[in-house]
Amino acid sequence: MSLVESPPWQALKSKYQELSSLHMRDFFAQDKKRGTRLSLEAAGLYFDYSKNRVDEKTIDLLCESANACNLPLRIEQLFSGKLTNESGEMVGFHTALRQVNNFSFKTNNNAIQEIHASWEKIKKLSIRIREGDYKGFTNKSITDIVNIGIGGSSLGPQMAYNALKPYVKAPLRCHFISNLDDTDFYETVRTLNPETTLFIITSKTFTTKETLENARRATEWLMQAAKKENLIQTHFMAVTAAPEKAHEFGIQKDNIFMLWPWVGGRFSVWSAAGLSLAIAIGWEEFFEFLRGAHAMDTHFRQAEFNKNMPILLALLSIWYINFFHAKTQAIIPYSQRLVYLPDYLTQLHMESLGKSVQLDGSAVHWQTGAVVWGDLGTNSQHSFHQLFLQGTMVIPVDFIAVLKNSRESHWQLPLIANCLGQSQTLMEGYDKEGVMRDLINQGIEHEKAEKLATYRLIRGNNPSNTIILEELNPYSLGSLLALYEHKVYVQSVIWNINPFDQWGVERGKHLAKDILQALQAETDQSSFDSSTERLINYVLKIKGNRP
């Protein structure tokens, strides 16, 4: 029986018909304790999902659908290393990287031992650099760490580093290079000193074009200063699942950190791919980061579905995507330090859930995934919240609020007020009675107020979740990221798709090689479609290679 034929799914269709014409204002008016009942706290996070177009029966039916998809079994498979891809290879075992409390796995003991060894290696290097004992080619201490990677090899560490900057030990600084455009590299290193700069090259396969090209640029940049190749070897580290390729590139074996094949790039910040972060904030704080994620892992494994934060977050997304036909979801963090979180979550969701084939190879017959995007509040209020408030689409929003930036900082009350104000307005709207009252109180005549009111009405009934961190620290950040990882995994289980591959992006990479040869005037262009051929010819014409 397919997903859409299951009894819970059919019941959800009827429930959608029942609720689609109701307004959330009425839910709150009829239930004064709705905000209390539809909220929970776990792993250092507070989650309010009361401003959603659901009642308790909806939640029950969504949970039944999850059970019908064998979610309990699939959760345990995630934590036991029993998930495999179409080739039978283990995937999705990233949760093992943060099992900090008495590793209790009954299988994969070798993986656990390797993780422990990796922890020790990361810890030792972190201490050496932070204490100034790791030297460059002129015997000066390292001050700048440049992470070269792309996708998950860059987005995760960069996002987490920016979020945890108050924990970075001066004078250490981290920088991140990912783009093939050489501007990214040269603008990043322009103010750096080669004598005190360490490059960390992160690539699972160590064949990633963008990463290797930037690594080559790093080599040239260092050689201009050091003159001798043997002098710059201490300025390179590699994180990879292909250590032999890293060694061939010129990385010393002792400077190569393991990235296992069963760790996907977008789930790799917990591994040595987070080396730059571990060095910057120190091993103790990095371990707190792992502990926070582990706390969310434990909650995810143990809590009942209707009290389970990642599961509820996923089921609500399923509700809007598959029944309200939402095509997009927004993430709005109200903290400057979380500026890169929307980009990170965009990749996590869209690369994991952008699939049209089920696990058995058959076609998907229901919508999967959505366009996930966002920006910082309050900046976003002055750019695109207008679409949320008075547009015509259903766009679920996750608001993420931080009460305090750190133990020493002041409460972020103005930010919190704006965040809560947006969620309340999305839910209740601004009806004609309220608009007219406010306009008349401003001294506007009734007839003119009637005309103006039409343009100021806000229908409301737009869904949102609010996630609150008491303080943004390594523990709470780890918990927050694990929350969304598990949310995405639950969605993949219900849709019966593989969240741990991304084959779609490979074809474009292959074609780029052929097109590059054509742009270098080395190959026949007859294999390209007429549009691509015309574009190639236009580029060549501008370059002066064609009349």
Curated annotation (Swiss-Prot):
It catalyses: alpha-D-glucose 6-phosphate = beta-D-fructose 6-phosphate. Pathway: Carbohydrate biosynthesis; gluconeogenesis; Carbohydrate degradation; glycolysis; D-glyceraldehyde 3-phosphate and glycerone phosphate from D-glucose: step 2/4. The keyword Aminoacyl-tRNA synthetase does not apply. Its EC number is 5.3.1.9. Signal peptide: none annotated. One of its GO terms (cellular component) is cytosol. One of its GO terms (molecular function) is monosaccharide binding. One of its GO terms (biological process) is glycolytic process. It is an enzyme of class 5 (isomerase). The active site is at E351 (proton donor), H382, K509. It holds the Pfam family PGI. Belongs to the GPI family. This is Glucose-6-phosphate isomerase. It comes from Coxiella burnetii (strain RSA 493 / Nine Mile phase I).
